Amino acid sequence: MNQTPRLSPIRAALLATGVLLSAREVWAQGCVASRCPVNMSPGERLLRSVDGNADHGGEAGIMVTVGYRWLRSDRHFTGTHEEAYRQQEGSEVINNSSYVDVTLAKAITPRFALQLTVPWSEHDRSSVVWDDPDRAKRTRILERFHVQSGGLGDIRLGGTMWVLDPTVHRRGNVLIGLGVDAPTGRKDEKAVHRRLIDNANDIVGDDLRNVDQSIQPGDGGWGIPVDVFAYYSLAKTLSVYASGSYLITPEETNGVITSRSNPFESVMSIADTFAGRVGFDWLVLPKAGLTVSLGMRAEGVPAEDLLGGSDGFRRPGVAVSIEPGISWMKNGWAVQLSVPIAVYRERFKSVADRQWEAASGVPRHGDAAFADYLILGAVTKSF
């Protein structure tokens, strides 16, 4: 008969907190700028792998996690249709983005913990200048230019709580989280862009303006993140997990001017975001604390928010990925790595798209660039 490994109350609260919101980057799928945190790897197996080692760190009730996320987005989609011609003609917009976050968690009781997350991001975005502003008359690309942005993101303070007593219910449990996102990241980062000044003579000049919404460090509004994480042990070395996050943004727009041709996209929208994961994990080497996992992941931006309006410029959409991962935990340390590979991408029609259609009678459905894969990593130390 399989026995559930011992799990101290403090370790349960701490590890669940770190698992649920470790690697709290400003999540993004390229141009679809989702700002939702999702756990890097399933938690029950990590709890088991740590407590399978006698010397797994102190019981001070503190956990520090440093998370990392990298992506390159250059695949353009309108709805579910890929605009393959963009890469063929070399006009694709390319985002190279790196996100680093530091999360400090403190267990208050065996069931409740508080945490503070400070995110940082760095971006490089490149696009092209055509020889004519009229798309129908374009014949060649004059140049490709790059803009950079980065800095402090929107800081989050939140709490998590086990639904069931983790000292009693060790085989399965549900963790819920609630917090607040403060608009500490810059919403109006600017950079020098290149634009066509004289198409008759192919003259290109500089233009200082706000960078694209997808590479702004912050979104300019307050948010209410709601999180849930659940696990259930199917066998001694096999578990199923599920998690979800939704960021509620009551404010509608942030007042930052865009350079969009659609007048209904003249200012940036403050959009809700969502993310979720489900899958299995397998403790392959219990004594070494080594776990492998396989699951599905979805993240994106809805076309309409739960609260408040949804006007302004946003690129709503969703990316669904297969997510293999590996994790190692021992002596109070945890290292996690996963590489989600996209299998489905869709750019939704936005409120601004529909407003354009109603005003002009002309169909409109904007596009968005997505990544083929992501690289996610996190290192955690418990004290």
Spans of features found by a protein language model:
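Outer membrane beta-barrel transmembrane domains
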Residues: 77-86, 247-383
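Short loop/turn motifs that connect adjacent beta-strands in outer-membrane beta-barrel proteins
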Residues: 29-32, 52-61, 73-76, 111, ...
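Surface-exposed strand-loop-strand hairpins of Gram-negative outer-membrane beta-barrel proteins
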Residues: 36-39, 70-99, 214
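Outer-membrane pore/translocation modules
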Residues: 122-269
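Membrane-embedded beta-strands of outer-membrane beta-barrel proteins
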Residues: 102, 157-159, 176, 226-228, ...
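Residues that define the transmembrane beta-barrel architecture of outer-membrane proteins
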Residues: 60, 96-100, 141, 149-155, ...
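Residue-level signature of outer-membrane beta-barrel architecture
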Residues: 68-70, 106, 118, 161-163, ...
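Transmembrane beta-barrel strands of outer-membrane/channel proteins
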Residues: 64-70, 116-120, 176-182, 242-246, ...
